[in-house]
């Protein structure tokens, strides 16, 4: 039976490259001269530290543009609340979303079931497997899910006949 997997993965090396490019641009930009803006990549999060809200927003814009250039979807970045830090600075955590959560998996399965296509979808850890008797039905599911905005970046992998 033909099947494929729906996953949401982020290439961490590309995230590291985007963060490094952001650091380089911050160090070279005129409006950041003399500021103490920092951006650090941790295991599954990016920590932003800036002088004020304006500079933090500028750092976020730079980070987003670098992520887009590196092929990283903005949907995979989950922004936390802006918190005050010591010395009048502000900080923000940006979580990098890896995998499909149970709630998003249920949403994907609901969309597939609403389509009335003859396929089955099931959640497996952080991915969703879709199986069906007909390869064309699976391709229709891919087309359907690409047209929907589910709040996560989806990749379709492991297509088997």
Curated annotation (Swiss-Prot):
Nucleotide-binding keyword on record: yes
Pfam families the UniProt entry points to: DUF520 (PF04461)
Signal peptide (from-to): none
Family annotation (InterPro entries): DUF520, UPF0234-like_C, UPF0234_N, YajQ-like_sf
Keyword Nucleotide-binding part of the UniProt annotation: yes
CDD domains linked to this entry: YajQ_like
UniProt keyword list: Nucleotide-binding
GO molecular function: nucleotide binding
GO cellular component assignments: cytosol
Role according to the record: Nucleotide-binding protein.
Stated family: Belongs to the YajQ family.
Entry protein name: Nucleotide-binding protein GSU3204
Organism: Geobacter sulfurreducens (strain ATCC 51573 / DSM 12127 / PCA)
């Amino acid at each position: 039976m033909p099947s494929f997997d729906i996953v949401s993965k982020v290439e961490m090396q590309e995230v590291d490259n985007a963060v490094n490019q952001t650091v380089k641009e911050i160090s070279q930009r005129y409006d950041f001269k003399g500021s103490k803006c920092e951006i650090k990549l941790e295991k599954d999060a990016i920590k932003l530290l800036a002088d004020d809200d304006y500079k933090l927003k500028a750092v976020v814009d730079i980070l987003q543009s670098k992520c887009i250039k590196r092929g990283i979807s903005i949907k995979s970045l989950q922004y936390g609340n802006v918190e005050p830090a010591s010395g009048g600075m502000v900080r923000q955590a940006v979580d990098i979303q890896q995998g499909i959560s149970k709630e998003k998996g249920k949403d994907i399965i609901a969309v597939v079931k609403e389509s009335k296509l003859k396929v089955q979808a099931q959640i497996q850890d952080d991915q969703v497997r879709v199986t069906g008797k007909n390869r064309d039905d699976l391709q229709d599911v891919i087309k359907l899910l690409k047209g929907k905005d589910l709040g996560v970046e989806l990749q379709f992998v492991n297509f088997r006949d």
